[in-house]
Every structure is written in C-alpha cells, then in structure tokens.
Amino acid sequence: MVVSAALVGAMLPSAFSEEATDAVEAKLTEMTLREKVGQLFWVRPEALDFSLNPEKKKLTQTMRQNLEQYPVGGIVVFKGNIQDESQLSSLIADFQSASKIPMIVAVDEEGGSVARLANHEAFSLPKYKSARDIGATGDPEQARQMGRTIGSYLRAYGFNLDFAPVADVDSNPANPVIGRRAYSTDAQQAAQMVTAAVEGFHEAGMLCTVKHFPGHGDTGQDSHYGTATSYKTWEEMKATEMLPFEAGIAAGVDVVMTAHITTPNATADGLPASLSYTMITERLRGELGFQGVIVTDALGMNAIKKYFAPAESAVAALCAGVDVLLMPSDLRAAFDGVIRAVEDGTLSEERLNESVRRILTLKQKAGLDLRGSAAAEQPLPEKTPDTKCSFSDWLKKLWSGADSAA
C-alpha cells in the first residue's frame, strides 16, 4: 500500500470550539442510558459475538444485533481480526455504518514487536526494529517520523486512534513486558522521544495514547498474567516515570492508558492503578493536569480478572476517574454492572456524562460527525451537577462480597 501524501500532512481538527461543544451537549442530551454506557466500552470485534466460535474477521448479523443491545463506543483490532487490506477496510467501514454513533477504531501499532499491521504477512508497510532503537539515535526527529508514518497508514485504513507511543521508562532490567518497547532507560530521553512521537501522530491526523500510567517499566512482573508491582514512592515516580507522561500531556496527547500495577508506596488503597482514585483522579487529573480521555489497559488481563468480577472492575474504574473500559473479560456482565450502578446510585449519571463528554469530544477531534437526530441547539446545563461516585460505598460492597464468597 502506498500512503497518500495528502494523509501525511493531515492535521487533527480542533475539538474545542463553541460549535463543537454545543454538538457534544446536543448529542449527550438525546442519548439513552444504554447509549451513554456503551460509549465507555471499547472492545475487540468478537466481544459482540456471544457464541463460542465468533467470526472475527467480519461483522456478522448476530454481531449487528448485539451491537444494538450493547452499543459500544469503539473497537480494537488485533492480528486475528485481519486477513488483508481489503477485508480490514471493509471490517472497519461495516462497524462504522452499523453504529448509531461513530466509533473509535483503535489498534496497538507501536512499531517494533507490537505492530498488528506492519508485522502481518499480508501487509507491506514500513517496519521499525523497536522504540529502543529509535531512542538510541538520540534524535527526536526519528520518533516524530515514526509517529507520522504509522499514523498515516493507520488513517488510510480507517483507524482513528493508536495505542502508542509507549511512555514507560525501562528502568527495571527484570521487567518482562516493556523492555525494547520503551524509548529508553533514561527518563529525560524517553520524554523527548514521546513529545516528538505525539507530534508526529498528530501531523498525520491520528489520535494517540501514552501508556502505561503510572509506569509499567519499573515492575518485575507482567500484568497480563498476574499482579505487577512498582515499589517506588510517588516522589520517586515524579522524578522518573512521570517525565515522559508529563511530556506527552504537554504535547497534547489525546488519551492516557492506565496500567494494572499496584503501587503500595505511592498510594494507600492497595488497588491496581486502573482502579485507584488516588492515582487516577488525584494524581493524573489533579497533579499532572490531564483533561483528555483516560482508558484502562485491557480489563481481561489477569491482574484484574483474577481478583475482580467484570462488573466490579468496571464500576471501580469509573469511580476512580477512568473514562473508557477496555476489553472486559465479559462485555455483557461489565456493561450490565455499570447500568445497575447508575440505577442504584453507586455511580451518578452526571459522573457518567462527564466521561461521555470527553469521549464524544475525542470523536469530534478525530473528525467523526456526531450529528444525526440531535437538535441543532440544546441549552447547556445551568449549574454544575453532582459528579461524585459512591467510591467508598462501592468498595465496601466489593470487599464485603469477596469476604462472603470466601
């Protein structure tokens, strides 16, 4: 595939004009509770096929019907969902046409070992050895060019979000999962590369993500398989792990992905960072000032699903301040759990609206059209509603249930 020169120079539109804000509020006003909750879930295509043998490479009639009942806000494409260029473009187009609200279509395309398209045998795309090799050049322009190149070919196929670049610092030699996916063992150098990469993605018109907050590079375990822990204090994290994340935020990154790591010396709650109000709301939102979309790492990873039921982890993440629940192990259970949490008051609807606003704003920034049956003009809220979540009450219920089960 030849990447069009027009795509390479495509900049992301601004999503913060008064007109854009009005469109978000208009859409929010007309949405049902299930539609709002659906925006919070980004899943693999097969999550919408509840049979044992889903057809992963196309949108089936069954999946279309399930999408009506579980109207997710985005899909995440993996190698198993891809056959060739034509099929991939059709898959994405079919999902977009089937969704009432345009979807975020995301992929892990970091360059190096994690590149669902470039490493696929059916594609002839630019390949990179690793982020580490880019960082080793000491030239941020190399990171910018990689972001621009990857963003351009993803956009050509219909993607609008890349779960890249990696902002972790590879500070623990025993780490089994980050390694060469990180730009450097040096936080300052990693920060320079992250800044340039974010700028490169945006120059290509591609939304991008820094991950895995608050830094998976310092752990000695892989959260895909179980508990992973960083023993650094918050002050130590601010001196190292936070530098690339702060750089990405300053560069205007669109999304921050959380890690399921526990940080016992940085927070007192004992929870994985993805479920920690201290780490998400107080630190990422408060101290670092990030106002964009926060997405969990996959909730189906063992660091979460071994200890929390799908509904529990979904609601706890929202109570912590997360916006998007990525790939729960059971979409229906997690989705229905969030519905129940709103209905019983554990999660206020305005807390829900807070995240939906951010997600819709992100979609506008991607150039997706939110218009439809929404009225052209809707009044904005006259007061600031209660956005609290009964977080302590929810945790009491969660741990009480765990004790009862034990």
Task: Describe the predicted segments one by one.
Residues 103-147:
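Substrate-binding cleft of extracellular glycoside hydrolase catalytic domains
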Residues 27-32, 50-62, 81-103, 113-115, ...:
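Second-shell residues forming the walls of enzyme active-site clefts
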Residues 2-10, 108:
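Bacterial N-terminal signal peptides
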Residues 65-79, 264-265:
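A short aromatic-anchored loop/beta-hairpin motif
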Residues 7-65, 70, 286-287, 305-406:
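Preference for extracellular/luminal or secreted protein segments
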Residues 129-159, 164-198, 202:
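A substrate-binding/cap region within the structured catalytic cores of diverse enzymes
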Residues 72-78, 160-168, 321-325:
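Divalent metal-dependent hydrolysis catalytic cores, especially in the metallo-beta-lactamase
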Residues 42, 76, 162-163, 209, ...:
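Conserved beta-strand positions in the central sheet of alpha/beta enzyme cores
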